[in-house]
Amino acid sequence: MAAPWWRAAFSVTGRCRGISTSASLSRRTPPLGPMPNEDIDVSNLERLEKYRSFERYRRRAEQEAHAPHWWRTYREYFLKETDPKDRINIGLPPPRVSRTQKLQERKRFLQELRANSEEERAARLRTASIPLEAVRAEWERTCGPYHKQRLAEYYGLYRDLFHGATFVPWVPLHVAYALGEEDLIPVYHGNEVTPTEASQAPEVTYEADKDSLWTLLFINLDGHLLEPDAEYLHWLVTNIPSNRVAEGQESCPYLPPFPARGSGFHRFAFLLFKQDKPINFSEDTRPSPCYQLAQRTFHTLDFYKKHQEAMTPAGLAFFQCRWDDSVTHTFHQLLDMREPVFEFVRPPPYHPKQKRFPHQQPLRYLDRYRDSHEPTYGIY
């Protein structure tokens, strides 16, 4: 007896699907190495060794995360990070402090704190006040320079200024813009400062020896209009005696920030270099006033290579800045040029090839492929 027509058709369709699946699986190549967790026998989970503590699990997870694998992560595909051990440190050496002296100082501080009954009573009653200035001074003296270095690496300052070379800013650099007669806008390490607030030269302070010489540099890393790998020099003060910036030689007068409209946030950095001796900066001197952007084109790496035998980077402070109304005044009145305006053109959204019979698709599926913006929803 012949089989029904629908049964024969089903058998043919099943065979065709099986052939197609087998053909697609045959094109798959085996992995280049063991897959994650392939060495774990999951047939009997109760017999597996338990961690029994979160700390033991954390150590094992960190060990596996840092172990070399045959595959690459998303970050390794797009970011070519160098080993921190291979980076060149161009900064000052760390201050030498005796380990015994540090332990004795901590022990003495704890003994004084325990002997103070008023501090103990205030802490118990939750009325104790913490001197934030003393906390910040202690932070800048101990772990603050390393935190600043990590922030600078996060914002890509070392990568774009020194092509990967790094340094620890051991000298605390304090920069503040005057806003009125009493208010100050501080520059920390990545905070936002508007061009209006930075229209005048800031107040720069740092601790220095009496007979030392310094160089202060203020640049814009992202604002060059013609060269993508160049910076704009906004301020350069050289041969500064001790911490008296006003008595230094102003090799380049101060120019307010002018991030172009539509270009987003720009990174502005203050770099402090310690000089070993007086340096002749005649080749780096700009005329005063200097309102030609071609004369303010600057390469920090070339500047450092030229004088690296006599100066060392020691301090760092930077902020982010974006366009406001004062930038228009800077372009028109100071730079005497038309203001450039940028606009980000988003790429068109990707849509797969339209199907003639979109099975199990909503009615608004057709809106993706219509030339007009008139929706189909509510028409039919």
Curated annotation (Swiss-Prot):
InterPro entries given for it? PEBP, PEBP-like_sf, PEBP_euk
- Main subcellular localisation: mitochondrion
Q: What is the lineage of its organism?
A: Eukaryota, Metazoa, Chordata, Craniata, Vertebrata
Q: Where in the cell is it found?
A: Mitochondrion
Q: What is this protein called?
A: Large ribosomal subunit protein mL38
Keywords assigned: Coiled coil, Mitochondrion, Ribonucleoprotein, Ribosomal protein, Transit peptide
Q: How does it assemble?
A: Component of the mitochondrial ribosome large subunit (39S) which comprises a 16S rRNA and about 50 distinct proteins.
User: Which residue ranges traverse the bilayer?
Assistant: none
Q: Which PANTHER family match?
A: LARGE RIBOSOMAL SUBUNIT PROTEIN ML38 (PTHR11362:SF133), PHOSPHATIDYLETHANOLAMINE-BINDING PROTEIN (PTHR11362)
Highest taxon, organism lineage: Eukaryota
Query: Mind telling me where the transit peptide is?
Result: 1-26
User: Could you name the Gene Ontology cellular component terms for this entry?
Assistant: mitochondrial large ribosomal subunit; mitochondrion
- What family is reported? Belongs to the phosphatidylethanolamine-binding protein family. Mitochondrion-specific ribosomal protein mL38 subfamily.
Coiled coil start-end: 98-123
Is Ribosomal protein one of the keywords UniProt gives this record? yes
